Structure formats: structure tokens, C-alpha cells
Design a protein with these regions (language model features):
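Cell-envelope/ECM-targeting effectors and their regulatory/trafficking segments
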Residues: 11, 19-22, 51-66, 80-173
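Active-site-adjacent loop/helix surface patches within enzyme catalytic domains
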Residues: 1-70
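Acidic helix-start/capping segments at beta-turn-to-alpha-helix junctions
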Residues: 72-82
Length: 173
């Protein structure tokens, strides 16, 4: 939590950090990703020094490996119902403002399931997928699926479409 970063596994090696899950229809996330483990129990804000280190590390990794903001996900995104980290207290907005992650927002009221699939969430029961989406994009959301959930998910899905088109190719993990 003091901002120190340690490389436990070289970036070009498989780290076995993510476990079972998928993103954008692709299984075996461990073989397609670089894991950043962040020390925080999840029930308190992440210290500024820790977030500064995350931003610096992400910026370097994204430049080295040509990773788009859509490629920056949490364990809860790729393993809904099984993983909950980095949790609702993680400062995703800081990453958004730094251009390192996608932002939720307002969009058309489209079916939630279609938007979550386009974003990359793996198949799971609707409540589990909604909970995983909310952990990342609407941590204050509660109860049954709402129009705000659908609008936010549609906005993120549209961002994914724009980023994919701008890159001229499908997202490659």
C-alpha cells in the first residue's frame, strides 16, 4: 500500500494470476494477460501513493504491449461471481481520467445482456453478470437491473466498438 511495485513474474511469462475466467469470449486469461496484484482488503479506499504506482505501471505496460484502455480489467470482470477484486473502492475513475481504462456513462437503453457480451463479460447468470458489471462501473448500484445499468453498459459497449474500429482490428489480449 506504500506504492512499491515488485515484478514477481516476467511480463512475457504466464503468471497463473487470474484463474478460471474469460474476457471477450476468450478463455485462459492467464495466457493473454499481465496481472497486477494490488494489496488492499477491498473495504477501504486505495491510498494515493498506491494508485500513483498503479498508474505508472499501467502506463508502462500498456505502451510496451500496445494494450488499449478496454484491455484494462479487474478480476471481477473476467470471473463474475468468483472474483470481486479490485472491488468497489478501487479508483477506476482515476484510471479513466489518465486514459488507462474505459468509463461507464450514459448511453441508449439497450438490453443489458447484449451490452455485457459486447464489453467482454463471460456467460453467467444475469444477476452475477450485473453484480460484476456494477463492481467496476456502477459500484453504488443496488437491487434489480435498472435503466441506469442498461444505459451505462450500452455506453461502455459503444466505447469498445469505437476503440476496436479505431485500432483497425479486434481486441487482442
Amino acid at each position: 500500500e506504500d506504492g512499491r511495485a515488485e515484478a514477481l513474474v516476467p511480463e512475457d511469462r504466464r503468471a497463473w494470476h487470474a484463474g478460471a475466467g474469460s474476457w471477450q469470449g476468450r478463455d485462459d486469461v492467464n495466457s493473454r494477460s499481465i496481472g497486477i496484484e494490488i494489496a488492499n482488503p477491498g473495504d477501504r479506499p486505495f491510498p494515493v501513493t498506491q494508485m500513483d504506482a498503479v498508474v505508472t505501471l499501467l502506463r508502462d505496460i500498456m505502451a510496451r504491449w500496445q494494450i488499449s484502455p478496454h484491455g484494462v480489467i479487474g478480476h471481477s470482470d473476467m470471473a463474475p461471481g468468483r472474483k470481486i477484486d479490485p472491488g468497489p473502492r478501487f479508483d477506476w475513475q482515476r484510471l479513466v481520467h489518465e486514459g488507462l481504462a474505459l468509463q461507464g456513462g450514459q448511453g441508449p437503453d439497450l438490453p443489458l445482456d447484449a451490452s455485457l457480451t459486447r464489453i467482454g463479460y463471460p456467460p453467467a447468470d444475469p444477476e452475477t453478470r450485473l453484480a460484476a458489471f456494477r463492481l467496476r462501473f456502477r459500484p453504488w448500484g443496488q437491487g434489480a437491473e435498472s435503466p441506469a445499468d442498461r444505459c451505462c453498459a450500452a455506453f461502455v459497449a459503444a466505447s469498445v466498438t469505437r476503440l476496436t474500429a479505431a485500432a483497425g482490428r479486434a481486441y487482442q489480449a
